[in-house]
Amino acid sequence: MGNSLGCVGLGERLAAAAKDGDAAEAQRLLAANPGLARCTTFGNLNSPLHVAAAKGHHEIAALLLENGADVNARNIYGQTPLMQACRFGHWEVVQTLLVFRCNVWRVENLSGRTALHMAAAGGHVKCVRLLVADAAGDRDGYVNKAANGGVTALHLAALHGHVECVHLLIDERASLAAQTLPCAAPPMASIGAGSTPLHYAACGGEVKCCQILVSRGADRTAINCNGWLPIDAARIWGCNWLEHVLSPKSHLPIPKFPPSGYLSQPLPSLIAIAREQGLNLSSEVSDGFDEGADACAVCLERPCTVAAEGCDHELCVKCAMDLCSVIKSYDSAGIAGEIPCPLCRTGIASFRTTAAPPPPSLAGSPARRSRRNNSGGGGGEHEASNSGGSEKGYGSIDPDAGAVVPLYYAPPFAPSAILT
């Protein structure tokens, strides 16, 4: 309470700046009093970090964290900033919070849901991708963690018909046989205890969700405590078009699904590197790094600090994180989850930190010019790539400067949401 009382005035102005995305005002207030970053508002006890996370302002979130904001702060409902970011699908805020070592296992007071439950319920597959990558040490336990009523993230994604989230969670070893408990909250209580994700998908009415579950081994003969098969749940909820998928006697073929395009092998290694280096979110960093350092070929603003294992192409850690958070993966030599390099399209399974740059006296040497030319070759086909091919929209080689000159780069857009 004392902390809240001290925030009246300046603290409310900081919360307003976090809500409006006014980074200049937030920086001015924090420069005068860094302790404002830890203030909370009256009533719901939201901190400025909660507000910035809910609104998707990742640069302000980073500024608050650098000034001592509690990354795991809870509001009156027990929600953390990570939960707010996942609720509204702000994956760039999720990135920032993970780099500052937020706890992905925290649960909401009333529902017992984690940030993963909220991301899955909202269909925010990029947030799901990041959360699962951070929990790589106990991925099975995290993906299958049940909220109140035994509801898992897969149950919620299936109920709301979020196909990509269902696909990714199954490939991350979410249990197809997880059953709910009698204390599930409405409207899930009406589905009945003992329900599997297939029961929930049947009530949701999305054909592809049911197809993915059945193709991966979900039991169409499972009976819940109401005595319902999944097909019975579909009929009761008015989803009769699912009968050909859910009927245990159906002979119609179920399509086979490849691994999810949102599997991302390099993300765990990148999160670990970003925690050591930071994300360098400032747009002014281009003037501050060594003359001998290469600029990232994607943003042309930050120094290259990570290299892809295999092709050895170098990027800044922020662009590498964005690449692995947004771009879909593909199977390469039977390995799912490799992300295509934006410069040569070689599959990337992990990243490493780059070696120290050569001294400035070597910056213009032929060997260095050759390395810069080689780093731009290969041509790419993804929206976040800036390859060295001659095709318009991806990049070109400047023969005089010997550097990659991007013709087009559209950073991924994170939808804004209104904090209610």
UniProtKB/Swiss-Prot annotation:
Region (Disordered): 355-397
SUPFAM superfamilies: Ankyrin repeat, RING/U-box
Reactions that this protein is recorded to catalyse: S-ubiquitinyl-[E2 ubiquitin-conjugating enzyme]-L-cysteine + [acceptor protein]-L-lysine = [E2 ubiquitin-conjugating enzyme]-L-cysteine + N(6)-ubiquitinyl-[acceptor protein]-L-lysine
GO molecular function: transferase activity; zinc ion binding
ANK repeats: 44-73, 77-106, 111-140, 149-178, 193-222
Record Pfam families: Ank, Ank_2, RING_XB3-XBAT31
Superkingdom of origin organism: Eukaryota
Sorted UniProt keywords: ANK repeat, Metal-binding, Repeat, Transferase, Ubl conjugation pathway, Zinc, Zinc-finger
InterPro entries xrefs: Ankyrin-SOCS_Box (IPR050663), Ankyrin_rpt (IPR002110), Ankyrin_rpt-contain_sf (IPR036770), RING_XB3-like (IPR056760), Znf_RING (IPR001841), Znf_RING/FYVE/PHD (IPR013083), Znf_RING_CS (IPR017907)
PROSITE patterns to which the protein is assigned, alphabetical: ANK_REP_REGION (PS50297), ANK_REPEAT (PS50088), ZF_RING_1 (PS00518), ZF_RING_2 (PS50089)
EC number of the protein: 2.3.2.27
Top-level enzyme category: transferase
Zinc finger region(s), RING-type: 296-345
Name of encoding gene: XBOS36
GO annotation, biological process: protein ubiquitination
Protein name (database record): Probable E3 ubiquitin-protein ligase XBOS36
Pathway(s) of this molecule: Protein modification; protein ubiquitination
